[in-house]
Amino acid sequence: MEDQFIDIGIDNARQLGGYTGADGRKVRQNVLIRTAGINDISDETAEKLASEYNVKYVVDFRMGYERDAAPDKEIPGAANEWISVYEPDMTDPVLVDMMNKMAEAGDDSFQKSIEYAKTGRLKDLYTEILFSESGQKGYAKFFDILLDNRDGAVLWHCTYGKDRTGVAAALILYALGVDEDVIMQDFLLTNEVYKNNIAYLEKELISRGCDEMVIGETQAMAGVKGEYLTAALDAVKEKYGSIQVYIKNQLGVSDEETEQLRNMYLE
């Protein structure tokens, strides 16, 4: 899967081209692009995305405060769509306590990671997104953008290009008929990108005397855990019957639109 990585000066930048989808057709090269944040990319990278990759839509899955703190760099000729797919319930006392402790941690990013891990919410993040109103409305809009795109590439991102972005990639690959094992392999490529970060965070957490539960969440904090996505997809299947039914009924992508997507993004 080395062909998925693209060297454009953005962390975790990959394209979904080459995977086998419905009827044995392949996902088109360089038209479905997933990345980490693009707020600090160079002018050269922005121009390359416009001229070489023909990016026509940028989809930003971050929350409002993330976008305000680090606005996207403008890509010439591309529409920028903000779709927050995760809006945590800040009336939840567990999350309120976490936010207070993270605020107390100040600039200590490691302590913030520890406080996040202690909530035990990491394992349920993808399930929360897929079942939430903001997640379903957001990914429905994402599919609308994919359907509206006629002559270029769509780039989507969050902060690190792993969770909200990874779920979006999984959904479009499902819609295109890509095998679930391949979808999971693509999802896990994030760990190759962030392997040094994962190792460094684990070492730091051990040095701080963190318990096994917190240390065990290292990969989910700095990378991704496949079992967490599997659990979310299994929950969707249990409630709705299949991922395709979820895409049709919860995200509003009709059978005709699914076929349209396949004609647009497979070859």
Regions found by a protein language model. Give the residues of each.
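Ser/Thr-glycine-rich phosphate-binding loops at phosphate-binding pockets of nucleotides
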Residues: 159-160, 164-165
